[in-house]
Amino acid sequence: MTDPRETVPPGNSGEETIEEAFAWLDRTVEAINREAVNHLPRELIFQVWQRSWRYWHDEQGMSQSYTKYRYLCLMQKAVFIHFKRGCTCLGGGHGPGGWRPGPPPPPPPGLV
């Protein structure tokens, strides 16, 4: 069985291209979203995405990749704290929409 973790992130091996680094970032953001949606309210994920985009991209003028990177850092921290506080999801998550009843809000754009 192969190890699903990436052993060398982009920027450390000296062999990758910028396109490979962006592809790695996209894959990692999608992976954290797939995991976060099982543990955090979808509305929270959507708001973090929207506010990250609004602040880092629109107000600060940062690139899309930088905005995704900052979003990734925030989501990693949120998921870490969720697990650190004692996740009781038991692998099943909180169901669609997180802890809030009703239909889930739309996912972050481009991160379905």
Curated annotation (Swiss-Prot):
Major place of residence: virion
Motif (Nuclear localization signal): 65-72
Residue ranges, annotated region (Binds to human NUP153): 61-80
Keyword Transcription: no
Annotated GO CC locations: host cell nucleus; virion component
Annotated Pfam families: VPR
Keyword rRNA processing recorded: no
Keywords on record: AIDS, Host nucleus, Host-virus interaction, Inhibition of host innate immune response by virus, Viral immunoevasion, Virion
InterPro entries to which the protein is assigned, alphabetical: Lentiviral_Vpx_assoc_factor, RetroV_VpR/X
A GO biological-process term: symbiont-mediated suppression of host innate immune response
Domain of life: Viruses
Subcellular location: Virion; Host nucleus
Coiled coil (residue ranges): none
Annotated function: Plays a role in nuclear translocation of the viral pre-integration complex (PIC), thus is required for the virus to infect non-dividing cells. Targets specific host proteins for degradation by the 26S proteasome. Acts by associating with the cellular CUL4A-DDB1 E3 ligase complex through direct interaction with host VPRPB/DCAF-1. This change in the E3 ligase substrate specificity results in the degradation of host SAMHD1. In turn, SAMHD1 depletion allows viral replication in host myeloid cells by preventing SAMHD1-mediated hydrolysis of intracellular dNTPs necessary for reverse transcription.
Family from the record: Belongs to the lentivirus VPX protein family.
The protein's assembly and partners: Interacts with the P6 region of unprocessed GAG. Interacts with host VPRBP/DCAF1, leading to change substrate specificity of the CUL4A-DDB1 E3 ligase complex. Interacts with host NUP153.
Protein name per UniProt: Protein Vpx
Naturally occurring in which organism (per UniProt): Human immunodeficiency virus type 2 subtype A (isolate CAM2) (HIV-2)
Taxonomic lineage: Viruses, Riboviria, Pararnavirae, Artverviricota, Revtraviricetes
